Design a protein with these regions (language model features):
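Short secondary-structure junctions
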Residues: 116-124
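Immediate N-terminus of the mature polypeptide
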Residues: 1-112, 124-187
């Protein structure tokens, strides 16, 4: 987990920057450590699997972070990042397509990036919902739970921009509302 809270400042859709958040007394804010960890997990590129089709046909760059190569063996870690970058040149397609729906792949990649938080019992459950919005946009909402309480609630907007040919992501780095706890159930 990060020790400090990060805040994204957006000049959307051209670029974005992430900065540290200071408390009123001048110390670094560490109150949103789990939300910051989720932002890092979803905002960095995970290593593509050997069977993944890369967005650039002539490229051999499978992305990822070199520290992930033996993360589990060396420091009991897990691969950091998300494979959403693989969708950079993808069209938003439906379930009838051979590779499956783009919205479904967005949800799968997000779940894969967040699953270590569940496996290591940092959170007890997650909800991931991606929805196509218009012709060029898929929005995703990510919620992490501890028991019935929502501890992280983030909205992600993933845009396919044919003009610049890359995936642009906007993160709401703070919880986007206080939702009522879920009813008790199996976790």
């Amino acid at each position: 987990m990060p020790d400090i809270r990060l805040q994204q400042y957006t000049d959307f859709p051209v670029s974005f920057a992430i900065d540290f958040v200071l408390m009123s007394d001048g110390t670094l804010d560490d109150t949103q450590a789990l939300a910051t960890a989720v932002i890092v997990a979803l905002g960095t590129n995970r290593l593509a699997t050997p069977t993944d089709l890369l967005p650039e046909p002539d490229s051999t760059d499978r992305q990822g972070w070199w520290g992930d190569l033996d993360a589990e063996e060396i420091w009991n870690g897990w691969p950091i990042g998300c494979r959403l970058w693989l969708l950079r040149r993808s069209k938003i397609i439906g379930t009838e397509a051979m590779g499956g729906a783009t919205v479904t792949r967005v949800e799968q990649y997000i779940r894969e990036a967040i699953q270590p938080f569940i496996d290591l019992k940092v959170a007890s459950d997650m909800d991931v919902k991606a929805v196509r919005v218009g012709v060029e946009q898929i929005n995703a909402r990510v919620r992490l739970y501890r028991g019935p309480a929502i501890v992280v609630d983030l909205q992600y907007e993933v845009l396919w921009d044919e003009l610049i040919g890359q995936i642009t992501t906007s993160y709401a780095a703070q919880p986007i509302g206080i939702a009522p706890p879920r009813p008790p159930g199996p976790y």
